[in-house]
């Protein structure tokens, strides 16, 4: 049994308790519902992009591509780059879509789909966001490459996560 805290509430995870079909929604082929992916089809190193067309632009730089899948706006390519396995996936627009993608990626690596239970050892994914943004500073020219150290959301999504350590 694992104990963790979400927003001042202690939760107990029972690894032997099976997840209901409403808590883990799988397609007929046992892939996760929205992304249409199976656990072995993603890397632990994942680049997310908003625009589905940008997935092919990123994976064009891979040395090889082993998987190309699409369901709705969610496009995924998995392959290798400099001998490292990597996946790139589109999230679409908005925090609600990003939330779906992140939750389903987490399920892919931390839930045993065949028994519908949590794995005893959790896997942490390395997720990188690659995208475009406008700038309000006049000294930043169009087409500049920027690396953000922090970001802030003005929506309510973070209220559902234990994010106090981020602030």
Predicted regions and their residues:
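N-terminal amphipathic/basic-hydrophobic helices that include classical n-h-c signal peptides
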Residues: 1-16
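Metabolite-binding pocket within alpha/beta catalytic cores that recognizes anionic/polar moieties
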Residues: 15-167
